[in-house]
Amino acid sequence: MGRVKPKFIKSLAEKLLEAYPDRFTESFKENKKAVAELADIPSKTVRNKVAGYITRLVKRQKAKEKAEQAA
């Protein structure tokens, strides 16, 4: 089982995704670079957790859109 992400990571990721939806993809590496450019996060660990959570959110959105199109 995975670990639950802290609230500040989730809220920051959601704010970034809402403000810049076209900057993020399903690629963690690209999202990591985008988070580094868009947010002032001094910690590498926190930056990676935010990028990882954004990657999960983007994948969920795409899967949801695909399921809606198939239905």
UniProtKB/Swiss-Prot annotation:
The keyword Transcription regulation does not apply. GO terms for cellular component: cytosol; ribonucleoprotein complex; ribosome. The keyword Cell wall biogenesis/degradation does not apply. One of its GO terms (molecular function) is structural constituent of ribosome. Keywords: Ribonucleoprotein, Ribosomal protein. It comes from the Archaea. One of its GO terms (biological process) is translation. Transmembrane segments: none annotated. Belongs to the eukaryotic ribosomal protein eS17 family. This is Small ribosomal subunit protein eS17. The lineage of its organism: Archaea, Thermoproteota, Thermoprotei, Thermoproteales, Thermoproteaceae. The gene is rps17e.
